[in-house]
Design a protein with these regions (language model features):
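Glycoside hydrolase catalytic-domain context in secreted enzymes
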Residues: 1-609, 616-617, 621-627, 632-704, ...
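Structured interaction patches on ligand/partner-binding surfaces of diverse proteins
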Residues: 733-736
Length: 742
């Protein structure tokens, strides 16, 4: 069923409804209309990294870990797995007339906001700090969820599920202020940073839904903004439905004070495109109609949009997806995809040669509050796994499988929690200031040839306002330090005289300076999924090479002093594109057990077909005048040939292409990501790859928000990390570079 057919059916159905019935369908928990054969439907469903809050499901790595894979194909496969499980659960529950919250097919994922500030608690729900990476992964996630990508193939008449790009448009903290805050962003920052991922999801992913944010953007509430709707529907041609974040419309009159009462909020939201209200304010739709402040046409329009989505999902027809059985939930294919994702997501930040751990090691100490923590596996917005494997359990299982448990071959794994995640003591009755697990931790270290220290955060310390235990910051972080209890533990363990491997499990940048100075190795494991501990163990012992790359910059804590205030949405000194200091670990960085190098073996200027104009992006703030472009309208991009060679062990790695504009004063100061590809090379293997960089990669954005190709000379960099002195210092390798004129 195409959209035109779905719209026609929706109009015919809505035409049969009474005014009260139409109004009732605009709430997230839409009631049944039995006389028309319409069952109840709840629009609120979550699928950030697996079907969430709906019982058993495959729990994939948290979104920030999925971003660290730099793997578009696996991202789409994971989203397809999620959609399959969503359909399986929907099929089973619908037959039992269970149509409650979290049990539908409209998934409010992905989160394509930009992780602009490392303090933001919800940053681990995103794909990191780079607009290009976020765009590419967001598009593939949308296609996977909706069944419209390469994995699903062509010819499917219905959506497998409906994705939702959120939170439109300028939203990344502070969490404590989100219900009242006005995010002020310049046209340049909007077009260059905050809008591209949404634009890509709409224009390339054909995303079925977009969610408006809680905050205001440049003075207008995001769920009642004429300017944002003009960009979304007018400039980009969005045709799906628009949903408010939960209780965001109530914020209009209670916190933003742009209206004075619920009926006025209903009017502002509906007239400006918010079709479904997650919250209670649309219970006043009939009041607004009776008062004469709202035209029925807006109610009808939104109702038709919502039923268009339901028809596209096949909710009133028989579809091929009806046959998906419940046995698809946590099936072998999905668990395998989760395992591959966990392996690809782990980032090796340092290795003095201790990794992989030698088979001759017979005593291993595992220490730390996240070593045996299930919470540290799953992040937020998660489902429930039928089995969890913590880091400790993964290590125990791996050595048992490799060595057995008998005779001289036995490997002893000692364990100590070491400290609480953030409290001073583990036991409530321990003496204040005693740090009651430190002595045990040091004893374990003394007994061990190698120590694995597992630290970090979990969803109780970084997350969404109202959902975390970190109430003093409403989910955001005050700084980039580990909790004091963990810093004390780390200091003691790093000085224990044994080689220490630090595993940090967090969804954001943590200042690991102490570990960088003294640890033998460091792994950034994110929140790796329900069974991720098994995959971390595979990396520790060399069954798999680490190959993840940082989707965010890792700063030192003092770097926060140079950044704008958290409430300042200017991009100055934020992210790798504008940060002027020296990061602890740069965006795009990550070591492997291999030794991969890249050379640029050729470039080719691409031209568009006769009569076609290359897509550089119209831009939310208008198109460039022909005189602003430094190239002809037929310029379609650059094809770059890269020869990659691995002089070490077999490994995956990620080819990264960066472009620097050498002429335009509007360009970002340094090179920015323009292409990437995950590759696999055996030991000693050499292969050549071709990567096409679109014309948009050569654009810059001026202060008016106009995107154009203003320069003719560019430098293209190719390698396995971001170009720059810090990357070279950490990896011992530099990117290949070539200057071109387009």
């Amino acid at each position: 069923m195409n959209r035109a057919e779905a719209e026609q059916k929706a109009r015919a159905l809505v035409a049969q409804m009474t005014l009260e019935e139409k109004a009732s369908q605009l709430k997230f928990d839409a009631p049944a209309i039995p006389r028309l054969g319409i069952p109840a439907y709840n629009w609120w469903n979550e699928a950030l990294h697996g079907v969430a809050r709906a019982g058993t499901a495959t729990v994939f790595p948290q979104a920030i870990g999925l971003a660290a894979m730099f793997d578009e194909d696996l991202m789409e496969e994971i989203a397809d797995c999620i959609a399959t499980e969503g359909r399986a659960k929907y099929n089973a529950q619908s037959k039992k007339e269970d149509r409650d919250i979290y049990k539908g097919l409209t998934f409010w994922s992905p989160n394509v906001n930009i992780f602009r500030d490392p303090r933001w608690g919800r940053g681990h729900e995103t794909y990191g700090e780079d607009p290009y990476l976020t765009s590419r992964l967001g598009v593939r996630f949308v296609r996977g969820l909706q069944g419209t990508g390469e994995i699903a193939g062509s010819g499917h008449p219905y959506l497998k599920s409906a994705a939702c790009a959120k939170h439109f448009a300028v939203h990344s903290g502070p969490e404590a202020l989100r219900h009242e805050f006005d995010a002020v962003a310049s046209p340049k920052d909007m077009e260059e940073t905050y809008l591209p991922a949404f634009e890509a999801c709409v224009k390339e992913g054909d995303v079925e839904a977009v969610m408006g944010a809680y905050n205001r953007t440049n003075g207008e509430v995001c769920c009642g903004s004429p300017k944002l709707q003009e960009i979304l529907r007018g400039k980009w041609g969005f045709q799906g439905h628009f949903v408010s974040d939960c209780w965001a419309v109530r914020d209009f009159h209670e916190h933003h004070h742009v209206t004075s009462r619920p009926e006025e909020s209903v009017k502002l939201a509906l007239e400006n495109g918010t079709d479904v209200n997650c919250g209670c304010t649309y219970e006043r739709v009939m009041n607004a109609l009776h008062e004469g402040i709202l035209d029925e046409a807006y109610v009808t329009r939104s109702c038709e949009r919502l039923f268009t989505t339901r028809y596209l999902l096949g909710m009133f027809d028989e579809t091929e997806y009806d046959a998906i059985p419940y046995s698809a939930v946590e099936c072998d294919r999905h668990l395998d995809a989760a395992a591959r994702a966990a392996r690809e997501s782990v980032v090796l930040l340092k290795n003095d040669g201790i990794l992989p751990i030698e088979e001759t090691v017979r005593t291993i100490g595992v220490i730390g509050p996240n070593a045996n923590s299930r919470k540290a596996l799953i992040g937020n917005y998660h489902g429930t796994s039928s089995r969890y494997v913590t880091v400790l359990e993964g290590i125990q299982d791996f050595v048992a499988d490799r060595h057995g448990l008998a005779g001289d071959e036995k490997v002893r794994v000692f364990y100590s929690e070491g400290c609480d995640l953030f409290r001073e003591n583990v036991e409530d009755l321990s003496a204040p200031g005693s740090h009651d697990r430190i002595a045990e931790a040091l004893t374990v270290a003394e007994q061990s040839e190698v120590v694995i220290l597992v630290v970090g955060l979990d969803e109780t310390l970084e997350g969404e306002e109202g959902d975390t235990g970190n109430s003093y910051a409403s989910g955001d972080k005050n700084d980039l330090l580990l909790p004091e209890s963990q810093r004390i533990l780390m200091e003691k363990v790093l000085d224990c005289g044994r080689p220490v491997i630090v595993i940090n499990m967090s969804g954001s940048s943590i200042d690991l300076s102490a570990a960088q100075e003294k640890a033998a190795a460091i792994l950034q494991a994110w929140y790796p999924g329900a069974r991720g501990g098994a995959n971390i163990a595979e990396i520790l012992f060399g069954a798999v090479s680490p190959s993840g790359k940082l989707p965010v910059t890792f700063y030192r804590n003092e770097d926060l002093d140079a950044m704008p205030a958290f409430t300042d949405y200017a991009m100055k000194d934020r992210t790798y594109r504008y940060f002027t200091g020296t990061p602890l670990y740069p965006f795009g960085y990550g070591l492997t057990y291999g030794d991969c190098k890249a050379q640029i073996s050729g470039t080719e200027i691409l031209k568009s077909s006769e009569g076609e104009k290359a897509e550089t992006g119209q831009g939310a703030f208008g198109s460039a005048d022909p005189g602003q472009s430094a190239v002809g309208s037929d310029f379609a991009g650059v094809r770059i040939s890269i020869t990659a060679q691995n002089e070490g062990r077999e490994t995956d790695d990620v080819l990264q292409i960066y472009v620097k504009d050498l002429e335009s004063p509007c360009a970002v100061p340094g090179p920015q990501l323009a292409g990437f590809r995950r590759i696999h090379l055996g030991g000693g293997e050499e292969r050549t790859y071709e990567i096409d960089l679109p014309a948009r990669a050569f654009t810059s954005v001026d202060e008016a928000g106009i995107r154009a190709i203003r320069g003719k000379k560019f430098c293209i960099y190719a390698g396995f990390q971001q170009p720059g002195a810090r990357s070279e210092e950490l990896t011992g390798a530099s990117c290949a570079a070539v200057e071109i004129e387009v």
